Structures are given as structure tokens and as C-alpha cells.
Amino acid sequence: MERCSRCHRLLLFLPLVLGLSAAPGWAGAPSVDVLRALRFPSLPDGVRRSKGVCPGDVAYRVARPAQLSAPTRQLFPGGFPKDFSLLTVVRTRPGLQAPLLTLYSAQGVQQLGLELGRPVRFLYEDQRGRPQASAQPIFRGLSLADGKWHHVAVAVKGQSVTLIVDCKKRVTRPLPRSVHPVLDTHGVVIFGAHILDDEVFEGDVQELLVVPGVQAAYQSCGQKDLECEREQRDGPQTQKPHRAQRSPKKEPARLHKPQSQEPQKQPTESLYYDYEPPYYDVMTTGTAPDYQYPTPGEEEGVLESSPLPFLEEEQTDLQVSPTADSFQAEEYGEGGTDSPAGFYDYTYGYGDDYREETELGPALSAETAHSGAVAHGPRGLKGEKGEPAVLEPGMFVEGPPGPEGPAGLAGPPGIQGNPGPVGDPGERGPPGRAGLPGSDGPPGPPGTSLMLPFRFGSSGGDKGPVVAAQEAQAQAILQQARLALRGPPGPMGYTGRPGPLGQPGSPGLKGESGDLGPQGPRGPQGLTGPPGKAGRRGRAGADGARGMPGEPGMKGDRGFDGLPGLPGEKGQRGDTGAQGLPGPPGEDGERGDDGEIGPRGLPGESGPRGLLGPKGPPGIPGPPGVRGMDGPHGPKGSLGPQGEPGPPGQQGTPGAQGLPGPQGAIGPHGEKGARGKPGLPGMPGSDGLPGHPGKEGPPGTKGNQGPSGPQGPLGYPGPRGVKGVDGIRGLKGHKGEKGEDGFPGFKGDIGVKGDRGEVGVPGSRGEDGPEGPKGRTGPTGDPGPTGLMGEKGKLGVPGLPGYPGRQGPKGSLGFPGFPGASGEKGARGLSGKSGPRGERGPTGPRGQRGPRGATGKSGAKGTSGGDGPHGPPGERGLPGPQGPNGFPGPKGPPGPAGKDGLPGHPGQRGEVGFQGKTGPPGPPGVVGPQGTAGESGPMGERGHSGPPGPPGEQGLPGTSGKEGTKGDPGPPGAPGKDGPAGLRGFPGERGLPGTAGGPGLKGNEGPAGPPGPAGSPGERGAAGSGGPIGPPGRPGPQGPPGAAGEKGVPGEKGPIGPTGRDGVQGPVGLPGPAGPPGVAGEDGDKGEVGDPGQKGTKGNKGEHGPPGPPGPIGPVGQPGAAGADGEPGARGPQGHFGAKGDEGTRGFNGPPGPIGLQGLPGPSGEKGETGDGGPMGPPGPPGPRGPAGPNGADGPQGSPGGVGNLGPPGEKGEPGESGSPGVQGEPGVKGPRGERGEKGESGQAGEAGPPGPKGPTGDNGPKGNPGPVGFPGDPGPPGEAGPRGQDGAKGDRGEDGEPGQPGSPGPTGENGPPGPLGKRGPAGTPGPEGRQGEKGAKGDPGAVGAPGKTGPVGPAGLAGKPGPDGLRGLPGSVGQQGRPGATGQAGPPGPVGPPGLPGLRGDAGAKGEKGHPGLIGLIGPTGEQGEKGDRGLPGPQGSPGQKGETGIPGASGPIGPGGPPGLPGPSGPKGAKGATGPAGPKGEKGVQGPPGHPGPPGEVIQPLPIQMPKKTRRSVDGSKLIQDEEAVPTGGAPGSPAGLEEIFGSLDSLREEIEQMRRPAGTQDSPARTCQDLKLCHPELPDGEYWVDPNQGCARDAFRVFCNFTAGGETCVTPRDDVTQFSYVDSEGSPVGVVQLTFLRLLSVSAHQDVSYPCSGVSQDGPLKLRGANEDELSPETSPYVKEFRDGCQTQQGRTVLEVRTPVLEQLPVLDASFADLGAPTRRGGVLLGPVCFMG
């Protein structure tokens, strides 16, 4: 029974196999058959049929020109599943690395892909760009490009992906995607190709499915193998196999060819397969033959077998269906177990090469299947058993089959079979009635043709094969998307043959809404339904007509506080109240007086070690140290560096003009120059086109609480309130401000002597006294500890040539140089003065014999005389050949400085020398060129106040000063003396440790310490054993010169190499050796006076002896004593360079030399490290008044404060400390001219300044517009003086004020003693602003001042007489509906809208003829619950139903917003005469009249009627105030009910308008300034699109933006979808103006924008340069505000995202972009701009 149970298990799997082989339906899941969706069965271009894995399977051969794609929405209409399985059976061309399936988003981003080859790549990217390119899973060690069939299953679940290959290898990799990943289904699905890649898939594919969930990937293995096993045993059929029977005999059966294809009636013996290796080599479980990738020619005849792992399990008895066609197994060649290249051909008895029946098997015996009778097997003939010949142990050779045996006995009848399949289709029925034509659908919006980069199948032609509804929909969408063109309908094709019976289909997609059916009978009345949900908030309706006055309502909420009433009459004194509860703690009091100085605290903890301080000033040269002992004589050094160029020789005559030399190489890139002056502002450019919409950014963090909103305008005064009940007596008020000094009292008695006062507050720092004499030199300090070794500094700029060093040891002879070009012959130089006598040269050859002289006259014979004098010298002989060069003579005195020679070629970089000691400071050089501006360092210590400088030149007249606060009048006191300096404050608390600083630059060496005693030389240690090779250390100091090496042979000159690329600018090289002498140049300009040379010793003039033979070099003599300085000798010839001398011991620092001549300008130094901030210095003297700064930005207005009750006047407090200046307020409206102010007190005497020139007379300012007429308010008592506000913006010049009273003259101060002129110190960094000094004593009256400026605006005057304007009338009732107006003219065309959504399905085509009725399909499995259908079209109007029962009252809805003002009503009755309006603006100043006569004595002013106390009494209902007739007459006055109603109506409408101003709603009629303001007013709003108007004013220029409240209230402006130029638009597509963007920048503190671009497989992508709105170049290399958010260029296809996040708001938005490698083959695609978001 064990074998039979396996049979049952196998039979249970077979129905699943049948379901799997038909496309959609892995175990019933809603899978997607990608091959069907891409129309593989219709064989598009590049696709043809081939044979699959198992016999009878159909695969598709894909060649290179195939281009297969479909919209993703068509395959996955309900969205792509989160966890899924991707299943495929595929065979690729060997060695191929190509994609199999790729899914792109609407923006062209690759979201999903499977790439086959070595290795296998799985690509995935969700909506948040995760995982990143570096984390994409790669399955290394797997190769699917071997030309064999492979079952591949990919299971994606959660954060991992598993690849299953051939049911054997299973590899899992992490997939770090988002928790809720989403893939965009608005793009396309592409088979076998990438958009940006040329590699395409070539090979065979039999199956490609996408199934939700991961179960299908794990269950596919067993089902696939069982399917192939069934094909092997049963032959190609779709009939369900019968239940297997147990055979009565256990004898293994042989595979025979059936006698007949018809089922035989007589009972026959059942056949059993027996898979034993000796008898049937095809089924061996050994090594299966390798799969060969057939050529196209052999494709039809060869069909590879697949591995059969299931044969290893057990032999299975399975009855063979008698209806199978001929099933043969033939061997070709020497195939089998030992032949790796064997092929097996399974042939079937079909007449056609290919028909659709290959998927279904041969024609089935429907009669047998339907009758339910037992199907008996045919009678078999028993064969003779062949005897296997044993060759070797365990090896068998199969013998030939024996002859057919006799027919066996009839087998027992089989058990009842399962019901057969559906029978053949019946005859064609009569055609049905034509259906009603469907109603036209609504026209769809234009479809998107974003990304369809591949060709699709050809259109038109004969009627194609039967396709599923999904394929038809795909074809329709693809045809529509193909450039949105539709050709004329083709001719009607022939009616196709009826197709074969198909497998049960998967549950279909949701159908479209059907036509409306006929109206059904009216149903019974339903039960009362539950109360519905609260409806959406309706739009505000128009105001209705004014209703009748209602009954008195409940007592309302407390109204707004009214203005303070008039002071009431004094009431009677109340009884003393009970002891009140202790009040809440009072507010913090004002700062008390400074306390006594406490005792000195304990010393604080030692702070952390500070950073290396700045270089100190050079110390005083120390005393000379003790001379050290002479060191041992060192070995001979190696070849020293090339010496400094010698002084040039005498000037040669100018040579002929040489030919122009060849063009030099491009020099290195110069340093960035100083920033130029800003250019003239350009004309404002036109608004650009909007850019592409960016991806939705990730939600940001919630921002900080924003500033308070602007203060609203003051409302109208409310109605006068009823007198309240006497309140509880308030707490004692705070001490008031100090009052003005009263009149001087009478002189008091002499008081008792007071106690000793407290120690006074340290006085301000006095002026520096005269400079004291220089102190004595202090003792030399102890040597400091050895400092830490600094890091190696950067290569410095080459210094100026140093002084000549001592003579060094002679270097070895260098290689001979290349012979130089022979120079032109120079002019003969002047004869040099005689040089010192050289050594005797070799004797020259004998001169030629001179010519014979003329025969002399014979003289008389003289007497023999004595030796006569020498005769005259004979003629000069010819010059002899040049003798060898003599030995170099002794070093001559240095000649005068020659002219500068030509610069030599740069030499090779020498080794790093020893670190030299710091010499004494040299004389100051000339002022060098201005270097680039360094970054501002931290604030240094505050320097001492310098002596007062001489008075400056006459300054320009300053701008008009702001009105100062009124000072307290102090008693005139004598000027006090400067107090002594205060004690030093205590050390502060230890600060928190600072962040670790970067590595500091190498510090300068400190001053030399006293030399230490010389140590005794140590013994030489033994040589250690060689250690392992360590890492390369830092370059050590220069070692002693090594022994001279042997001279190398110069190598042959190599061939000229190819021209290399321009190299990167190298570091500045050391001076090279002198080059060959160049052509003599023209006379240069006169050089500057050089430094005086060292005075040389006078040489002895040697005699000019004959050259002698060279003698041996003698030993080096001891140095002789220095001779006395001789007179300068004659100028000698230029001497040879001496060899480098030994390095001497360091001498003592000499005293500073005299100030030298101005040196050459040095190169600009590198930028120094930022210094530490110094402690705050003492407050300096007040500096001169600086120029007026620009007006600051408008600050936000504060929220309006409620009007408080009038408090009792407090005592005047001490003057408080000066507060920090407040935010600049908005410029106020020009107020009316104030009345003449009271005479101010005499101010402090200022220092006598130089009289300024008279300024030009300004124009009179424009007269202000009269303000709106306000309601007369009750005059309030004068309020307390508020804190001093920030100075407002400079207003227009007011009209000339009356001349002020001349001030009293003040005495001129004495001139102080002139201070000594100090040395000019370095410019210190400006110190922090000191605290405001204490108020000084009142000075003496100043000199007569110029006429004073216009005084401040005085307080508002008393209310004027009533004006003629009446009050606002009552709103009228609603008028009748007007007639519709005439049609207006057509407006201008609107802006281009954004691309629309994908279009709806197009109009239905012409209805074709009705086809033949198809076969009745099998009953499919029950589909899953479909999605809820779309809402149908509205049905016809039903008959009115009966009135239902009264429903349950619904919940009270939210109170709706106030509706807009209603239509103007009809004119009401004429209102009563209104109260007199306020006084108009003051008129212009008239001509001053003559003084009037003295007036009569004054009278008591009666209060105005509005100021008179009103006696009120409350009516019965409390809703009105009934006033006595003596107060105000009734009839429309403010006290009457009609007047109050009108006032309240006006107040309500005003309150709504003010509320909209205070809390804008972000709509087009009520736009906010920024999204930040909107978030502050409405923190509950979600992210979305709202209207903003940054420049306020009229709301017609408001634009729509995206508000990211999640990120704290960012205002995001979208770029326009246009590739020609970058511009920015609102959400409606309208361009955003430059002015609005400027205001948006002013209201923001930072901005950011993302820029992305696609790239393809480059390790170093060319940089993208961006141009900001202020023409700045932005890139990660040039700007610290540009970061690479994601670098996707390292992978095959990726996308690099740059993020520009800058506080320099003028840089954004980005206006242009360029690639450095534009035109490269790897540069594809464009730039995608994200929205620019401003953060307020």
C-alpha cells in the first residue's frame, strides 16, 4: 500500500499541474502571465515558437530585434503586490548577461528587474529610493547563461529576496526596502531590455509569471517536476488520469508501441512502466545529457530532455491511457548515460508541424470519456525475456527486443472511471438578435505618451488569433499610446475557425459598467435607515433677508473688553474687607543695585589644555652661549645640490632678434583672484518656463514654533459698558519710575555723620597716561618644556636666495651634459685687469721663424765694445695653440652685482633639508599685493584705548539723528576725576569642552633657548639583525653625504613618446640647476639697489709668471689668522662656484640689523587657522559715528494686545539698562503734523564739534492722504510710557518746524596735553560692543547750537467738532434677481496646464459581425471577491415615494464659517443725522499773523456731550439700554436700538474681515504670506496645495504652492515641465513672478532643492554644475551647500541626486545645469529638478 499511497499523492498533484501549465493561476492565486500580456502567442517581430522543456511544451524564441513592452497599469491594475513570486522557465544564449524583465516608473526610474547571466542580479527600488544602489542583491556564483533550461523562482518577502534555481540551489539575500514599499504602476513593463542599455535578451522562454505571495515560488518545484513526469508517462494529453490499479503481477513491464490508436474493446492486461536503468537508458538517474542550444536549423527536430529528479524516489505504477498516440523513444548516436552530448527525440503522431492542439494533446475520445465505461487496455503480446550479457560486474548491455508474444488474457474490469471531459461542440446555432447599441462613453482626457520607447506589433491585416480580454485591452491601450494616432479601421477579416476548448481561465478583471436595465417594479418601502454620517461642510450660503427681531436670548458669552470708561464719581468708602489670600508670586523685580564684592573665591579647576597660541613676538636676543666642542670630521659628502646661479658676466652686445619660439604649454591654473566689484544690475529677465515636477520629498520634522503673527489693526470702540460692581482692592503696585525732580525744597538741618559707604562700583577705565620709560631687561627665563612635534607642514613657497654657504666637500663628477648649442660670437670685451699669477703652465711649442730682415748697410768696423743694451723686441710671433686650462685660482673678491640672468629651467625636486632655526626678524619688506580676503577670524582680545589722535578732517554733514529719550535732569555737578581701575574679576566657571579642532598648522619655532652643554659622544653599538620591512616612514632628515658612486653609462635616447594629457598642477618646485647660456638679451630695466655685499679681503697681487707644470695637490693647511681688512682690490674675473662647505655650528643671535631697503613683495600667504577668541577687553572709548546703515528687513507684527484697565500711576523707577534693539518695525504711515511741543529741558553739553557745512534744503514731503473717518472714541487718560521702540525707518521729510529756542552757550573744554605719537599698531579686529555706560553727570551748558530739528510728533489733540459724515446705514433687504448680463469677450488664453491623467478608454469601434459561437468552457473555479464596482450611471427618475417617517434627529453639525456678505439690499430709510466726525487733517501752515490782544480770563470748559456722564438703567429684558432724555436725543443715534444694531452689524463684519487678516485661510481670496504663517494660524492643516501672497497687498497676484507642514511649514514652488529652460510655476501652471520670489526669500531663513540625473555604470561620473539664481556656480566641489544625497552612478543604471541646502537664499532656485562630460557615451538623459522649498 505504500506504493499506492504515493500514487494517490501523485494523482492529487496532477490537477495542480494542469492549473499551473495554463497561464494564470498558481494554486488559484491571481497571477499575471507576462508572456500573454506582452502578446507572445501572436508572435510579434523577433519572436517565434520553439519547443519547451517537456515534450509538448511550447516556448518562444526571442531574437535581438524584438521590442516587447506594455503599460504596467494593464498588467497590475490593482497595484503591484508588496510580497510576490516571480517564476520563469528560461534558456538563454551562452555567455549572455541581459535583463529578462524590467518595470519602470512614469519618471523612467527602474523599479524592478531580473538580470540573468553570471551573476544573477535582482534590481528593486521603491517609492523612497530604497534599497540604494550599493545594497541591491547580487547572486554571485550562479550562472544561468549556459544554454540550458532552468526553472527560476524569485520570492520577495519583507526585507529579503530568495532565488531558487532548478529546485536545488536556494540563495537568500537581504533587501533593505521600506516598511511599506510601493511601486509606481503608471510606467511600462519591458521584456528583455533596458531603456539605457544596448544589451538585450536572446534565448527561449516558456513561462514568465508574477504571483502575489511567496508560496508559489516554493511550491512550483514539485509541481513542475510532476508535470514533466506526467508528460513522459502519459504522452501529451489533458485528460485526467484514472486512478492507478495494483497489478496482479510484479513482473516489470516493457514499453511497447501500441497496436492501434483506437481503444480496443477486449480486456487486455495493464501495462506498467518500470524505470530500471539496465532496460531503459532514457530514464537513467545518472548524469543527464547536457542541454545543447540548438541552431535554428535543428530546432524543430531536436528536443532536449530535462533532468528528472523525481525518478530517484521510487518506481511508480501508473496505468497508461490507451488513447495515447505513438510514443517512441529512440537513441541517436551513442547517447545514454555515458554520452554527454546525446539527444533524445520524442516524436508524436501529428500530421502538422504545429497546431494549437499541441497544448491540449491529440483529439480525445469523447465517447469513452462521457459514457463512464471502463477503459480497457489493448491486448499485449508477451515478449521473450532477453538475457543480459554480463561484461563486468554491475554493467549490462541491453539486448535487442524479442518478438511480440501472444495476446495475453483479458484483464479484470477496471473500476468506475471519473466523468469524462466536455464533449465536442455542437453545431452552430442560429444567430441571435442584434443587441442595442451601447451609449457613447464620455470623451477621455488626452493620454500620456511618456515612455513607450519600443515598437509594438503591426496594426491592421487579417483577423488574428483569439485573444483574451486582457490582451485586447493591452492592444487597445498600446495602440492608443502610440503617438496618440489612430488610423482608419482596416477591412473586416474572415471569420476564424472555432478555437479549441481552452483551460478554465483565471478570474477576470473587473468589467466595465453595463448598460442600464429596464426599470424594475417598485419595491416595498424600506425600513428607516440608520442616521447617516455627517455630511461635508457645505459652502456658505448667501445672507438671507433680515428677520424679525427674535425673543430675548440667553445671556451671551463675555464680549470683548471695551475701552475704559470715563472716571466715575468717587464712591463712599467701603468697609474694610477680610484678609485676602496671599497673592500669586509677583513678577521678577527690576535688577537691584550691585551688591558688595564678595570674598575672593577658591581657584577654579585647571581648564583643559588650550590650543596652540598665536606666535609670540620675537624675544630679546639671549646672551651668547658657551662655544661647543668641535665635532669629528665627517665623511665626504655626496654630490650636493646645484648651487645658486653665479653673478652674471659682463653684459654682451645685444644679439640679433631670434625667431619666435614655439608656443609654450598652457600654464597652471592661477589662483582665484580677488572678488571683483559687483557688476551693474542686469535687466530683470522674463519669467522662465516651469520645470518638471519633482518627487514628493520625505516628510520633514516638525518645525519650531514660529514668531507671533502680525498685530491687527485696532478695532472700533465697543459700546459703553454698564458700570461694574466695585472690585476687590488690588495688590500694592510695583514701584513706579522715578518722577521728575520736584522744586527744590528748603534747606534742611545738618544731618548726623553717616556710616562709611560701601565700596563703590569700579569706575570706567581712565585714559591711558603718558608712555613710561622703558623698563630694564629682565632676567632670562628658564627654558620652557620641549614642545610637541608639530605635524609636517605643507610645502612652502620657495624663499628668496639665501647667503652663500660655506665651502662644502667636492662632489663627484656628474654625467656629461648634452652639448649646448653654439652661441653667436660675442663682441670683444674690455681687457680685464691683470689677474693673480697662475701656476706655471707647460712650455709652449717654438714659434715659427720670423721673416728675414733687410740687409743692413755695412758699417764701419768699430772697436770691440762692451755688451750693449738689449735690442728692441722682435715682431710678435703667431699665437701658439691654446694650452690646457689652469687650475682654479683662489677665490677672488665678489664683483659688483651683475644684471639678472635669464631664469633657468626648473630642476628636480631636492630632498627635504634640515629644519632651520628661526632667525631674528628681518627688516620689513615692501607692501605686497593685496591677497585674497581670508575668512574673518574670531574676535580677538580688546586692545587698550590708544591715545587720542589728531582731529580729523571736516566730515560730511551726518544724517538727521533719531529723537533721543528724554534724560533725567540732574543737578549740575563738577566733572569728576577718573576713578581707579577696578579689581580684576573672578575667573569664570569652567566651560564645557569644545569640539575637537582640526589639526593645526605647524607652528613657528619658538625663540632659541640657551644652548645646553655638549654631550660626550657615545660608543658605537653593534649592528642589529635585519628586521622585517616596515611601513614607509616619514622622509627623514637629510643624511650625511654618501660615498661617490661609480659613474653610470648614459643610456640611449629613447623614442619620443605620445603626447600625454595635461597633468594636474604640481607643487611649486625648488629652483633647478642653471640652464645652458641663452642668447644674450637686450638691456633690462635698471634693477633695484641690491643688498650690500659682504666686504671681501684684499688679495695680494701675484706676479704674472709663465705657466708651470701642474704640481701635486698639497695637504690642506691650517687656517691662518685673519688678516686685516685691505682696501678693495681691482675687479677680478668671475670665479667658479665653490663646493658646498661643512655646516658650521650655529652662531649667536646678533643684534637686529638696521632696517634694510624695501624688499620685494612676497607671495600671498596661505590662509591661517582661525585663532581662539580672546577674552573680552575693557570697554573702549566711544568711536566716531559710523555711516547710516541700510534699513533692516520688516519684522513680523506682534499679536494685538487687549486694552487693559487704567492702572494707578506708579512711582518712577530707576532708569533700567538699555535693552537689545527690537526687530525693525514696518514703516508707519506718515502721520499728521503734530502741534508744537513743550520746551525740552536743556540737554547735556556735547563736545564742541567742528561746524558742519550747511546742507541742501530738502524738498517738502507730499501731503498725506486723509485717513478714514473713525468713530469718536471716549478720550482715555494718558497711558503709561511704553518701552522705547526700535527706531523706525526714516520717514519723509516733514514740513519746516518753527525755529527752536537758542540753547545756552557752553564753555569750550580745555585742550588736553598732546600725547606722544604712538607707533602704528596692527589693525585689531573690532571688539564686541560694550555695554552702555552709566549715565553721566549733567554737563555744563553747551555752546549755542544750530536751530533744532523738528520735534517728535506730539500727542493726539482733543476730539474735534462733529463732522458732517453720517453713520453706516442698515443693510438693505435682498433685491430681485437681475437679468443675466451679456456674454463677455473671450479672455486671453490661459497658461499651459500640466499633463493630464491617462485617458479613459476610447470610443468603441465599429461593431463587427457576430462570430461563431465558441465552445462551452469548463466551469472555472470560483473567483475571489471582486472589487466594488464603479458607481453606475444615474437611473431614470423613479416615481416619488411616500413621505417617510420622521427620522431620528441628527447630531448637531459644526458651526459653519461666516458666509460672505450678502447682496446689497434695497436702500433703507434715510438714517438720522450722524454724529460729527473727527477733525480733518491739519491744514498747511499759514502766514504768521500779528500778535493778538490779551484774552479774557479763562472759563471752565464744559464736557462734550459724548463725555458727559450718562445715567443708564437696564430694561426688563436687559437687551437694550434706555437712556434718559437728558443724555442724547433718540432716533438713529448710537444709543437707539437701530443705531446699536447698525454698529453691531458693522462690528461683526469688521470682525470677520479682521479675523481673515489675522488668520488667513490659504485660499485664493485669503492667501497667507508663507506656509509658515499658515501653519502658525492653522496647525491642524494637512500637507497640500495652498495660496500664498508673499508681497501681501492685492491678492490677485497670489499663487498656489505646496505646503509641507510636516517639515515645519516649507513653502515649495514647483519647476515647470519644460526642457528648454528652467523656470518655476505655481500648482496652476502660472509662472511665479520675480518679485514674489524675492519677497519669499526675505521671509525665509533657508531653502533647499534636489537635482537628479540618470547615469550608467561609470565609477567617476562627470560633475554636474548648477547655476543659481544669483549666477553662482553650485557643485559639490565648489560649494559647501551642495551635497551628494545619493550616488547611483556606480551601478549599471542609477540616478545621482544632489541636494542644495543653503542659507544664501539668493542662490535658489536653480536656473541652469551643465555636465562636464556632455556628449560622452555614458551620458544619457537629462536633469530632473525637484521643487524649491523655502523655510521661514
UniProtKB/Swiss-Prot annotation:
Q: Which residues form the propeptide?
A: 1501-1736
Gene Ontology terms describing biological process: chondrocyte differentiation; collagen fibril organization; sensory perception of sound; skeletal system morphogenesis; tissue homeostasis
Q: Which domain of life is it from?
A: Eukaryota
Q: Where is the composition biased (Gly residues)?
A: 994-1003, 1198-1207
Q: Where is the sequence biased in composition, kind Polar residues? A: 258-269
- Disulphide bridges, residue numbers: C1571-C1603, C1612-C1733, C1655-C1689
Comp. bias regions, Low complexity: 497-533, 650-668, 776-789, 842-861, 1115-1133, 1155-1164, 1188-1197, 1217-1230, 1256-1272, 1376-1386, 1469-1481
Single Gene Ontology MF annotation: metal ion binding
**InterPro entries reported in the protein's UniProt record:** Collagen (IPR008160), Collagen_superfamily (IPR050149), ConA-like_dom_sf (IPR013320), Fib_collagen_C (IPR000885), Laminin_G (IPR001791), TSPN-like_N (IPR048287)
**Signal peptide as annotated in the record:** 1-27
Keywords, comma-separated and alphabetical:
Calcium, Collagen, Disulfide bond, Extracellular matrix, Glycoprotein, Hydroxylation, Metal-binding, Repeat, Secreted, Signal
Q: Where is this region: Disordered?
A: 228-270, 364-465, 485-1538
Region (Nonhelical region) residue ranges read 215-486
Q: How is it modified after translation?
A: Prolines at the third position of the tripeptide repeating unit (G-X-Y) are hydroxylated in some or all of the chains.
Where is this gene product found?
Secreted, Extracellular space, Extracellular matrix
Q: Does the keyword Transport apply?
A: no
Query: Where is carbohydrate linked to this protein?
Result: N1604
> Start and end of every Collagen-like domain?
399-447, 487-545, 546-583, 682-737, 868-924, 967-1025, 1026-1055, 1056-1086, 1114-1172, 1393-1447, 1448-1499
**Residue ranges with Pro residues bias:** 615-624, 1029-1040, 1176-1187, 1388-1397, 1457-1467
> Where does the protein principally reside?
secreted
Q: What does this protein do?
A: May play an important role in fibrillogenesis by controlling lateral growth of collagen II fibrils.
What is known about its subunit structure? Trimers composed of three different chains: alpha 1(XI), alpha 2(XI), and alpha 3(XI). Alpha 3(XI) is a post-translational modification of alpha 1(II). Alpha 1(V) can also be found instead of alpha 3(XI)=1(II).
Family note? Belongs to the fibrillar collagen family.
**What is the name of this protein?**
Collagen alpha-2(XI) chain
Q: Which organism is it from?
A: Mus musculus (Mouse)
